[in-house]
């Protein structure tokens, strides 16, 4: 007699090599607690529809409680001979309670069972991720509030462009994370649909009531097509895509932190606990955490491509290919959760160096656009103002000074519209304060946005 639940069809046992190759217990046992949740809800529904009696349900609940304790204490022995988490738990349950354990799988297939387990697990991961996104946003909001007036260069093409504040810069990432949170919430709506009851692919002949199971498991909707229910992994791809975008955003911030911490910039310092040294160079303080975040973003993006590729050629309904969805999905969630958790802590350990930031602003003619706007407001067409200021910048560059350091008579040599009030717009602070509109970089607007985000998060 074979040891497989499906072995009656076969004339010889599966080879050891095939067992090792096809077994998923090494990674899908992670779904054990969610598998038990689904089984308990399924058992309750079977009892309410008359498939199981009260005694069977009581035995199943007792047995599952014991198995759950074994799992949490690390005492359960997982067997690759039983292939996966579902059969391991079912065999353990049957060993404990006998025939009632064998009845549990009535009206159910591993196809809809695993699809349910993954959705239950992923739903919980998304809840954790959304909380961690908000925690990181809070850390960034604290930095933004503290640095609403801390002038730094805004860049395009990594060249000094216009003055902004460090607070305004941090708020850009708060906005990105806000969209990330929205995407996760939207993804969760599609994750939160129950496939259980689809059985192998066509449904079941038993008088099941899927709405009972859905309510017990907290699913907001029920998958309406049994073929789609067992073969759908859109939700996994969608989650991994949303996770990839978060990692891309954090990778962009990491790149900036790495640059800003370098002596060539010197805009910030990162607390020692997030950095490492060199085995040969005593002076080194390396920003390993943001570097690793930058690297791990590629890992998560790779999982997205892997899942899309996994699904692209599968006919309906379930195929063994889908066993390969779990490891990239698990690793995506783990990587994202770990990254968000450490990132919030790291941002609380960032020290800003305002003097270095302001000095960088003064080296790049960052207020040139402000001078052009000044001339336009005095009646000069913008294209003419652009040309006049370009000539002034070239002169200042050759003289080795900032526009604000040019004498008035020199500036007036470029246009007689220039008066001594020009110096109010040529300072970085004047440039910031002039942009006092919704979404602008003025300190007043930064404080408004910080307040708005705090109120939305409350």
Swiss-Prot record:
Pathway: Amino-acid biosynthesis; L-arginine biosynthesis; L-arginine from L-ornithine and carbamoyl phosphate: step 3/3. Its EC number is 4.3.2.1. GO terms for cellular component: cytosol. It catalyses: 2-(N(omega)-L-arginino)succinate = fumarate + L-arginine. Keywords: Amino-acid biosynthesis, Arginine biosynthesis, Cytoplasm, Lyase. It is found in: Cytoplasm. It is an enzyme of class 4 (lyase). PROSITE patterns: FUMARATE_LYASES. The keyword Plastid does not apply. It comes from the Bacteria. GO terms for biological process: arginine biosynthetic process via ornithine; L-arginine biosynthetic process. InterPro entries: Arg_succ_lyase_C, Argininosuccinate_lyase, Fumarase/histidase_N, Fumarate_lyase_CS, Fumarate_lyase_fam, Fumarate_lyase_N, L-Aspartase-like. One of its GO terms (molecular function) is argininosuccinate lyase activity. Belongs to the lyase 1 family. Argininosuccinate lyase subfamily. NCBIfam families: argH. This is Argininosuccinate lyase.
């Amino acid at each position: 007699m074979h040891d497989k639940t499906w072995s009656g069809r076969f004339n010889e046992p599966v080879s050891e090599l095939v067992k090792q190759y096809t077994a998923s217990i090494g990674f899908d046992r992670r779904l054990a607690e969610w598998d038990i949740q689904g089984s308990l809800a399924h058992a309750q529904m079977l009892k309410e529809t008359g498939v199981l009696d009260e005694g069977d349900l009581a035995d199943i609940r007792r047995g599952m409680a014991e198995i759950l304790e074994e799992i949490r204490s690390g005492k359960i022995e997982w067997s690759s001979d039983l292939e996966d988490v579902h059969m391991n738990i079912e065999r353990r349950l049957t060993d404990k309670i006998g025939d009632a354990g064998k009845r549990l799988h009535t009206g159910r297939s591993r196809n809809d069972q695993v699809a349910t387990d993954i959705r239950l697990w992923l739903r919980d991961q998304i809840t954790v991720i959304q909380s961690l996104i908000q925690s990181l946003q809070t850390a960034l909001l604290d930095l933004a509030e503290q640095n609403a007036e801390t002038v730094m260069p805004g860049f395009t093409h990594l060249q000094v462009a216009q003055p902004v504040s460090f607070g305004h810069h941090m708020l850009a990432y708060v906005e990105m994370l806000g969209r990330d949170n929205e995407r996760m919430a939207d993804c969760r709506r599609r994750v939160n649909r129950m496939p259980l009851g689809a059985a192998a692919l066509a449904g079941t002949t038993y008088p099941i009531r899927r709405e009972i199971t859905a309510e017990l498991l907290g699913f907001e909707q029920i998958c309406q097509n049994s073929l789609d229910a067992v073969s759908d992994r859109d939700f996994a791809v969608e989650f991994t895509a949303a996770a990839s975008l978060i990692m891309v955003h954090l990778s962009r911030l990491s790149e900036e932190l790495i640059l800003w911490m370098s002596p060539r910039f010197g805009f910030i310092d990162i607390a020692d606990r997030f950095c490492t040294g060199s085995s040969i160079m005593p002076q080194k303080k390396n920003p390993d955490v943001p570097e690793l975040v930058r690297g791990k973003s590629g890992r998560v993006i790779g999982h997205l491509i892997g899942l899309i590729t996994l699904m692209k050629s599968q006919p309906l309904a379930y195929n063994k290919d889908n066993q390969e969805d779990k490891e990239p999905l698990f690793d995506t969630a783990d990587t994202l959760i770990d990254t968000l958790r450490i990132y919030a802590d790291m941002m609380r350990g960032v020290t800003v160096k305002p003097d270095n930031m302001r000095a960088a602003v003064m080296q790049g003619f960052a207020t040139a656009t402000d001078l052009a706007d000044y001339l336009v407001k005095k009646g000069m067409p913008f294209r003419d103002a652009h040309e006049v200021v370009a000539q002034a910048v070239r002169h200042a560059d050759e003289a080795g000074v900032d526009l604000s350091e040019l004498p008035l008579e020199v500036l007036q040599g470029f246009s007689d519209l220039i008066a001594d009030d020009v110096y109010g717009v040529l300072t970085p602070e004047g440039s910031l304060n002039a942009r006092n509109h919704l979404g602008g970089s003025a300190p007043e607007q930064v404080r408004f946005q910080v307040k708005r985000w705090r109120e939305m998060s409350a």
